[in-house]
Regions:
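A generic local secondary-structure boundary/capping motif
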Residues: 59-64, 127, 184-185, 209-212, ...
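A short helix->loop->beta-strand "cap" motif at the edges of active sites that frequently abuts
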Residues: 159-160, 217-218, 281-285
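ADP-ribose/adenylate-binding Rossmann-like module
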Residues: 138-141, 165, 264-296
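A short, aliphatic-rich alpha-helical micro-motif
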Residues: 131, 189, 256-257, 277-280
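Short, acidic/small-residue loops that bind anionic groups at enzyme active sites
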Residues: 157-171, 288-291
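Glycine-rich phosphate/diphosphate-binding loop of Rossmann-like nucleotide-binding domains
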Residues: 81, 86-106, 164, 172-264
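Structured core elements
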Residues: 72, 112-114, 136-138, 195-196, ...
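N-terminal ligand-binding/catalytic initiation module
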Residues: 1-162
Length: 296
């Protein structure tokens, strides 16, 4: 096996983000703004007309403003990529990056919002109070288990779509890949044994979706930095991990991968060795998805 390295240096990555204009986002008007009349319509006094209309019916914001095609990408920087809690400001390049992906591939306008708080209730309150500004919210890089609580509450309290990308985006892609890989290797989902490295938002969501698709609960061994999530374990457990605890004598990722058909990596670089891969079932399915560097 060879390790795939990026085709750029650190300096090139920094130059990309700083030149010729710092960052990756800008705002472009959708109206010509070429004459005094345009300016009077865009701002005062013309803007008062849609203001009054929206005051009568707030749903008209979808007709008279950019709300319907505008998503907020929101983070507090407590779980940036696989790098950990580096703070809200450090998350900004990632959030800008997600925003430009929305624009490039779906023509959805987006803005990054960094919230400088680690308090769950404060974060919920802040996002709830500004959330209706946009047509949807993409939560990103918020630590587990707080991210589950935040998403659940915001879905209940806001009248717009709320999507936690680290959970659902990762799970959807991983599940789709697993279905295809099983078809290619002649496996049935109900029969595969799965080892998952990483019990954060992405790992738990992947486990939940593949279980929903037909992988047996007892065939999913989830591991975190403490080891296998097994029934009776008390160290570093919470209600979300407990939902995936199984009866097993295995206690380490090495043991979990022994004989496994599938490995889903959502942890850190270097977590898996060649020997661990060799111990898996023949023709193993390996998704090493640690970010920014894979497990192997």
């Amino acid at each position: 096996m060879t390790s795939k390295r990026p085709t750029f240096t650190d300096k090139e990555a920094l130059d990309f983000h700083s030149q010729p204009t710092p960052g990756k986002l800008s705002v472009t008007p959708t109206k010509p703004m070429a004459t005094q009349r345009d300016l009077s319509l865009a701002y005062s006094p013309g803007v008062a007309v849609p203001v009054k209309a929206i005051a009568e019916d707030k749903d008209l914001a979808y007709e008279y403003t950019s709300k319907g095609n505008m998503v907020a990408v929101i983070s507090n920087g407590t779980a940036i990529l696989g790098l950990g809690d580096l703070g809200a400001m450090a998350s900004k390049p990632v959030m800008e990056g997600k925003s430009v992906l929305f624009k490039r591939f779906a023509d959805v306008d987006s803005v990054d919002v960094e919230v400088f708080s680690k308090d769950t209730e404060e974060l919920i309150t802040t996002i709830r109070n500004i959330g209706e500004t946009w047509g949807g919210i993409n939560l990103e890089d918020i630590a587990s288990p707080e991210c589950f609580i935040i998403e659940s509450r915001l879905r209940e309290e806001l009248d717009i779509p709320v999507f936690h990308d680290d959970q659902h985006g990762t799970a959807i892609i991983a599940a789709a890949g697993l279905i295809n890989a099983c078809n290619i290797t002649g496996r049935e989902l109900k029969d595969v044994k799965v080892a998952i490295s990483g019990a954060g938002a992405a790992g738990l969501s992947c486990a939940g979706l593949i279980r929903h698709l037909g992988v047996k609960a007892e065939n999913i061994l989830m591991c975190d930095s403490t080891g296998v999530v097994y029934e009776g374990r008390t160290e570093r457990m919470d209600q979300f991990k407990s939902a995936f605890a199984v009866k097993t004598e295995k206690r380490t990722l090495t043991e979990a991968m022994d004989g496994a058909d599938v490995f889903l990596g959502l942890s850190i670089a270097g977590a898996v060795s060649k020997e661990m891969v060799a111990s898996m079932a023949p023709n193993p399915i390996i998704f090493a998805m640690a970010n920014p560097d894979p497990e192997i």
